[in-house]
Amino acid sequence: MLTLGLESSCDETSCSLVQNGKILANKIASQDIHASYGGVIPELASRAHLQTFPELLTAATQSAGVSLEDIELISVANTPGLIGALSIGVNFAKGLASGLKRPLIGVNHVEAHLYAACMEAPATQFPALGLAISGAHTSLFLMPDATTFLLIGKTRDDAIGETFDKVARFLGLPYPGGQKLEELAREGDADAFAFSPARVSGYDFSFSGLKTAVLYALKGNNSSAKAPFPEVSETQKRNIAASFQKAVFMTIAQKLPDIVKAFSCESLIVGGGVANNSYFRRLLNQICSLPIYFPSSQLCSDNAAMIAGLGERLFCNRTHVSKEVIPCARYQWESACS
């Protein structure tokens, strides 16, 4: 089956063609326009998706060596995300599905991040613990199989990627700051600052306290939002970045062994943009004795290959297929703890 995937949940526009699980083309267009604002502007994101989808679709079909008529299924990210951005993708998908007379399936963007690792590791062991870490999400799932996601825990405040971006801004790094902070941290001393990992009861996370701790480290007692940041040496910036990175990832890592035991998981699946962090990958390999599955770098960021892959799998299994595909900004998962 040849599946077209479409992704527009935030600020990446992507078109991909996947055939029976094999990626034939995966085109991604990032929106640099948001950098000057220090964050994603929803209206600008929607406009960019609208302008970019047609040319990106042409590029994907040409790269894969197929025509629109060869497409057998259209899979689109319809939840969760920015409602305007999602609507652009869903409407574009509906137009194609109607014109080509092809079936259309909606796919959960967060679930697709975890499925991305399964696309590249067909022999993934289940039940698995799924960890989705991105700019907007930090969630743990019990995965009895590759297409079932039961919520175990989530962040109570900021997502981990959002926290990275905010701390990067404190350090004077441009948006998006996650990767730039990681690069800065490589040259720093992770033990220079005693940022304690946040401890939250149960299986949830909290990152707002770490963000505040970094603010105090930079501003001292004068940590109000209006107070200017003092001059900080490059060495101190590197040390703060390294210490923050260690603490923020330990916030997650310290919970995993108990959760794996509680839910009898046989593997760990990690997905999302933050899953590309090399420090976190090394940390997980040190503390986890289970097999760990990460997507390749190109499948960590928002992309349509994961949307096409999961959509194809769901359609072939005839599971979770809705006749009506509706964009939805938020999604409520069934709990694994009930």
Curated annotation (Swiss-Prot):
**Stored InterPro entries:** ATPase_NBD, Gcp-like_dom, KAE1/TsaD, Peptidase_M22_CS, TsaD
Q: Name one GO biological process term.
A: tRNA threonylcarbamoyladenosine modification
Q: What class of enzyme is it?
A: transferase
What is this protein for, i.e. what is its function? Required for the formation of a threonylcarbamoyl group on adenosine at position 37 (t(6)A37) in tRNAs that read codons beginning with adenine. Is involved in the transfer of the threonylcarbamoyl moiety of threonylcarbamoyl-AMP (TC-AMP) to the N6 group of A37, together with TsaE and TsaB. TsaD likely plays a direct catalytic role in this reaction.
Chain residues that bind substrate? A132, I133, S134, G135, A136, D165, G178, N277
Q: Which SUPFAM superfamilies match?
A: Actin-like ATPase domain (SSF53067)
Location of this chain's protein in the cell = Cytoplasm
User: What cellular-component terms does GO give this entry?
Assistant: cytoplasm
Stated name of the protein: tRNA N6-adenosine threonylcarbamoyltransferase
Catalytic activity field: L-threonylcarbamoyladenylate + adenosine(37) in tRNA = N(6)-L-threonylcarbamoyladenosine(37) in tRNA + AMP + H(+)
Task: Name the Pfam families on file.
Answer: TsaD
Question: Main subcellular localization, coarse class?
Answer: cytoplasm
Task: List the taxonomic lineage.
Answer: Bacteria, Pseudomonadati, Chlamydiota, Chlamydiia, Chlamydiales
The cofactor note from the UniProt entry for this protein is:
Binds 1 Fe(2+) ion per subunit.
Q: What is its EC number?
A: 2.3.1.234
Q: Can you tell which superkingdom this protein's organism belongs to?
A: Bacteria
Question: Which residues make up the binding site for Fe cation?
Answer: H109, H113, D302
Q: Which UniProt keywords apply?
A: Acyltransferase, Cytoplasm, Iron, Metal-binding, Transferase, tRNA processing
Checking PROSITE patterns in the record gives: GLYCOPROTEASE (PS01016)
